[in-house]
Curated annotation (Swiss-Prot):
Keywords: Glycoprotein, Lyase, Metal-binding, NAD, Oxidoreductase, Secreted, Signal, Zinc
Keyword rRNA-binding annotated: no
Protein name: Bifunctional monodehydroascorbate reductase and carbonic anhydrase nectarin-3
Taxonomic lineage from the root: Eukaryota, Viridiplantae, Streptophyta, Embryophyta, Tracheophyta
Positions contributing to Zn(2+) binding: 122, 124, 141
Residues annotated as the enzyme's active site: 97 (proton acceptor)
One example of a Gene Ontology biological process annotation: response to oxygen radical
Family named by the database record: Belongs to the alpha-carbonic anhydrase family.
Recorded name of the encoding gene: NEC3
InterPro entries noted in UniProt: Alpha_CA_prokaryot-like, CA_dom, CA_dom_sf, Carbonic_anhydrase_a-class, Carbonic_anhydrase_a-class_CS
Glycosylation sites: 89, 112, 262
Role played: Bifunctional enzyme which has both carbonate dehydratase and monodehydroascorbate reductase activities. May be involved in regulation of nectar pH. May also regulate nectar ascorbate concentration, protecting floral tissues from free radical damage.
One term of GO molecular function: carbonate dehydratase activity
Tissue/organ expression: Expressed most strongly in nectary gland. Also at lower levels in the ovary, style, stigma, floral tube and at low levels in anthers/filaments.
Keyword Ligase in record: no
Length: 274
């Protein structure tokens, strides 16, 4: 009986320690661990020192970068993006540092015969990538993941204009609901990612990383050359929905470190939405 009691106590202790470990490991998604304040101890320059599993944030293949298009190499075999997006059940999630739209089955992007499922999209204000040194008002990230855990992210930049972004217009009312409450999820029904209107003909491509901790490297980045328009009101809705201090949630540009930047089209400058 005594041995059974000891065994029971050890088992209970194991469960307690396991729960502590799981609670700690789940803290990676806590945005209070990092900030975008460049003067803060947990600001972007120090992300790689905050946690051992964030050390890649100090790596050599980090994103975002400044894309100087005269240095981009035109690659003739870069094809029009092979995407097969489709309407999907969608959930809007406030992650504290940004607003994410998660898709149950939004279709896929195919690169070199590998399918990358469209998992989610989110927004950064201002833009994270710059083009020829110019930073824009907003950047959307369409995050795709393959079956073996590799990422492709499509970045679309926006400037303030007279015309609202049609895709954001579809979810404007839903953006008001999870305001300033981290972890709030809300199903918003069927969303069609094709409404983003990405033609996929002219883009830059390079190898980089995720732009938030853990800053995983080896990410294929595709930056659309066309600058879309968004209204001040739409940007304000995105900023008001996140936690205080994350209204500006763009990581500074990182060293290029002589990486190859490929392009499907040779020209100087960017294309404006007509």
């Amino acid at each position: 009986m005594r041995m059974a009691a000891i065994t029971k106590m050890l088992f209970i202790s194991f469960l307690f320690l396991s729960s502590v470990f799981l609670a700690r490991s789940g803290e990676v998604d806590d945005e209070s661990e990092f900030s975008y304040d460049e003067k803060s101890e947990n600001g972007p320059a120090n992300w790689g020192n905050i946690r051992p599993d964030w050390k890649e944030c100090s790596g050599k293949l980090q994103s975002p970068i400044d894309i100087f298009d005269l240095r981009a190499e035109v690659v003739s075999n870069l094809r029009i993006l092979q995407k097969d997006y489709k309407p999907s059940n969608a959930t809007l999630l406030n992650r504290g540092h940004d607003i994410m739209l998660r898709l149950d089955d939004g279709g896929y992007l195919k690169i070199n015969e590998t399918q990358y499922q469209l998992k989610q999209l989110h927004w950064h204000t201002p833009s994270e990538h710059t083009i020829n040194g110019e930073r824009f008002n907003l950047e959307a990230h369409l995050v795709h993941e393959s079956n073996n855990g590799k990422f492709v992210v499509i970045g679309i930049v926006y400037e303030i204009g007279l015309w609202p972004d049609p895709f954001l217009s579809m979810i404007e009312n839903d953006l008001k609901v999870p305001a300033n409450k981290k972890g709030i999820e809300r199903g918003i029904g069927i969303i069609d990612p094709n409404q983003i209107k990405l033609d996929g003909k002219k883009y830059f491509r390079y190898i980089g990383s995720l732009t938030t901790p853990p800053c995983t490297e080896g990410v294929v980045w595709i930056i659309d050359r066309k600058v879309k328009t968004v209204t001040r009101r739409q940007i304000k809705l995105l900023q008001e929905a996140v936690h205080d201090g994350f209204e500006t949630n763009a990581r500074p540009t990182q060293p290029e470190n002589e990486r190859y930047i490929n392009s499907t089209y040779h020209s100087f400058g960017i294309e404006k939405q007509q």
